[in-house]
Amino acid sequence: STLIKSILGLNKPLSGKIKLGIKQNQIGYLPQQSEIQKDFPASVQEVVQSGFMGRHKFFPFCTKEEKKKAVAEMERLEITELANRCYRELSGGQQQRVFLARALCAAEKLIVLDEPVTGLDPRVTANMYEIISEINKQSKITVIMVSHDVRAAMRYASHILHVGHDETFFGTVNEYMKSETAQRFLL
């Protein structure tokens, strides 16, 4: 989570620089769920459309094109029927889909997901991983995801960055599976 926040410019690195080659407003971010998020007093549609607000400095309204994209993202995530419901009345899985739709409205090049399935039941978790994989493949959006679920990461990711207390690994899933890091971690 600290690395993610540094990539997003929310935390300043202790040393060095992080260069992404894209603008901050081209990044969608789905943070870890918090109690404050769970009690957000807005409609689903308002939450999803708020993903565009990083693009507007002083103009708090969405354009027609942005509203169409918000509807398209809600359709993709199968939450259209929830558009007028209050966000805080939704289940945890529905709330995560809403925030994923919001992040997709913000994203043009990169989406950063910080523990997107924490607290979700196994069926909803598997569905979220499938949706995220589909987004990556169909929309050609790079996905960076923090997860403690290494087995799911090996199933859905193309590359693994394993950051431990004493070691760090970065490489393809196949390289990771053959590494000493994976052998120690997965036993």
Where are each of the predicted segments found?
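Catalytic Walker B motif of ABC-type/P-loop ATPase nucleotide-binding domains
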Residues: 111-114
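Conserved ABC ATPase "signature" region
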Residues: 49, 64-82
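H-loop/switch region of ABC-family ATPase nucleotide-binding domains
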Residues: 147-148
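H-loop (His-switch) and adjacent beta-strand-loop-beta switch element
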Residues: 160-172
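Conserved ABC ATPase signature
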Residues: 86-90, 94
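Helix N-cap at the start of a conserved alpha-helix in ABC-type nucleotide-binding domains
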Residues: 122-124
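Helix-to-loop junction immediately C-terminal to a conserved catalytic motif
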Residues: 8
